[in-house]
Structure formats: structure tokens, C-alpha cells
């Protein structure tokens, strides 16, 4: 992977920083694993905006990614690594020995031609998926399940990983990238290694239009609005808002705690930093 800084031949190119990966597949994706993806523009079935800053963007197909990795004991060959517009990580197309193909989140270091396998007795190798009880303590993992059989939910974005730091009884303890220490059932599965495309955070889109290509609309500051539109709005001249930061609906923001899931509080050994 190479980090390319564009020459400032125009204002729109001046701040562009690209991440170029020569190993990515340059052709079309695997058609049987594609689904139609329609855009909502951030509106619900009443036509009202439920999520701000969404609209436009390039048309996309959804890639059906296998988050369960439940095809046990059957070796698979990595056919190619592909770009996926729906996520920051790359995806890998696997061809199993019985002929079936599936997409998975591409682990770091896995290239076309590699052999991967999942199951209880899978070897300890990047890209293989095992139950947490069979993974050595200290291992770096990604794609971790929270409920056995539900599919990966933790550490799925570009460069993400977690570390298995302890095993006790029916649970293992994970250290997440946020600093949180969390208990997870040992029967849950995880994939060894970290997620690919860790250089994603180094890129710079360079101009507002590149955000619009991705379906992201502008964000207007509350202090630039009128009082009818935002709690921070109004005032003569420029103001600081006059109160602690809140959302357009008056809820505290910018650091205010929002977690309210008491049911799983006992699973968190240490809160995130």
C-alpha cells in the first residue's frame, strides 16, 4: 500500500491524499453476492428527516459479507481482495473446496492464494476463525461475536482489532481499541489478526465535493442558526452559544455520556477511556 499526495494542480487537488493498493481487484464484484441498495436520503416512511447530513452520493450495490464464518472444516482459497463502498475495510472473496464463494472482511496480510479455514480445530493463523475458548491468550483478533452464532459485531472497521487478555470459566476478557475491557462468552467466535486497510485514517478527501460523492451533506453549526432552529441560535453578532453544547433537541453533547444499557453493564470490566 502506498500513500500518494497529489500535486496541487487545482484547488480541489491541493489537499488530496490517497491510499493506493495495487493488490485490489480492478474488475467487477462477484454478482451472485450483490444486492440492491436503495438510498433513503436520511428520511423515514413519512418523508421526514430522521438522520441529518445524508443525501445524494454514488449508486452502490451491497456486498453480502459472511460475518458468521460457520462453514467449518472446509478449506477456502482467497481468490482476490476487493474494495467495498459500504465499509472502510477491504473484503476478500473466498472459494471453498466445495465450490461455494463467500465474501469476508479481509484480514491484514491476507493476499490472493492464501488458504483459510474456520472451526474448532483451525490452526492459529491470521484469517482463520475459531471459538474464543480455542484462541491463545494474548492473541490479536477481530470480527468478534457478542452472542454465539449471531455473527461478528466487534472490531470490523479498517485497522480495527481487539486483544484476548484473559480466560476464566465460561467467559473471556477482551481489551478493545477504545480501552474498554469487556467479558464475552467463550463460545463466541472471532477471527485471528487485525482488519485490513489500516492506512484508511491517513487519507484526505481534499474537498467538500468528495464528501458529496459519498452521500454526506454539509453540517451547519448551531450558533450559525436562528433561535427557532437550534438552542445555540440567535444573538447579536457572533456568540459562543451561551450554554454547554447541546443537540438541536436540547440533549447534552460533545462528551456527555449516552450509554444506558444496564442489562450488559456487568459485562464491562473497565469503561472506555
Curated annotation (Swiss-Prot):
* GO CC annotation terms, alphabetical: large ribosomal subunit
InterPro entries with a match to the protein in the record: NA-bd_OB-fold, Rib_uL2_dom2, Ribosomal_uL2, Ribosomal_uL2_bac/org-type, Ribosomal_uL2_C, Ribosomal_uL2_CS, Ribosomal_uL2_dom3, Ribosomal_uL2_RNA-bd_dom
Query: Which UniProt keywords are given for this protein, alphabetically ordered?
Result: Ribonucleoprotein, Ribosomal protein, RNA-binding, rRNA-binding
Matches recorded under SUPFAM superfamilies: Nucleic acid-binding proteins (SSF50249), Translation proteins SH3-like domain (SSF50104)
> Do you know which Pfam families this protein is assigned to?
Ribosomal_L2 (PF00181), Ribosomal_L2_C (PF03947)
Give this protein's Gene Ontology molecular function annotations. Answer: rRNA binding; structural constituent of ribosome; transferase activity
GO biological process terms, alphabetically, are: cytoplasmic translation
Tell me the subunit arrangement: Part of the 50S ribosomal subunit. Forms a bridge to the 30S subunit in the 70S ribosome.
Q: Which family does it belong to?
A: Belongs to the universal ribosomal protein uL2 family.
**NCBIfam families given for it?**
rplB_bact (TIGR01171)
Q: What is this protein called?
A: Large ribosomal subunit protein uL2
> Upper taxonomic classification of the species?
Bacteria, Pseudomonadati, Pseudomonadota, Gammaproteobacteria, Pseudomonadales
Amino acid at each position: 500500500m502506498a500513500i500518494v499526495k497529489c500535486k496541487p494542480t487545482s484547488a480541489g487537488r491541493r489537499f488530496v491524499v490517497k491510499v493506493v493498493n495495487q493488490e485490489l481487484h480492478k474488475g467487477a464484484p462477484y454478482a451472485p453476492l450483490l444486492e440492491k441498495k436503495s438510498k433513503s436520503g436520511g428520511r423515514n416512511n413519512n418523508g421526514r428527516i430522521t438522520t441529518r447530513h445524508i443525501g445524494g452520493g454514488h449508486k452502490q450495490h451491497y456486498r453480502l459479507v459472511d460475518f458468521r464464518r460457520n462453514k467449518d472444516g472446509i478449506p477456502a482459497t482467497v481468490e482476490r481482495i476487493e474494495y467495498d463502498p459500504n465499509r472502510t475495510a477491504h473484503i476478500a472473496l473466498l472459494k471453498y473446496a466445495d465450490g461455494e464463494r463467500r465474501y469476508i472482511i479481509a484480514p491484514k496480510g491476507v493476499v490472493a492464494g492464501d488458504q483459510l479455514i474456520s472451526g474448532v480445530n483451525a490452526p492459529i493463523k491470521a484469517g482463520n476463525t475459531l471459538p474464543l475458548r480455542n484462541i491463545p491468550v494474548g492473541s490479536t483478533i477481530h470480527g468478534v461475536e457478542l452472542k454465539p452464532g449471531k455473527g461478528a459485531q466487534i472490531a470490523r472497521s479498517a485497522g480495527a482489532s481487539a486483544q484476548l487478555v484473559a480466560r476464566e470459566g465460561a467467559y473471556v476478557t477482551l481489551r478493545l481499541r477504545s480501552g474498554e475491557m469487556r467479558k464475552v462468552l467463550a463460545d463466541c467466535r472471532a477471527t485471528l489478526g487485525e482488519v485490513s486497510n489500516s492506512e484508511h485514517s491517513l487519507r484526505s478527501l481534499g474537498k467538500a465535493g468528495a464528501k458529496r460523492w459519498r452521500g454526506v451533506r454539509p453540517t451547519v453549526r448551531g450558533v450559525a442558526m436562528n433561535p427557532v432552529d437550534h438552542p445555540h441560535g440567535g444573538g447579536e453578532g457572533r456568540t459562543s452559544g451561551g450554554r454547554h453544547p447541546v443537540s438541536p433537541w436540547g440533549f447534552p453533547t460533545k462528551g456527555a455520556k449516552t450509554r444506558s444499557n444496564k442489562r450488559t453493564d456487568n459485562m464491562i470490566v473497565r469503561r472506555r477511556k
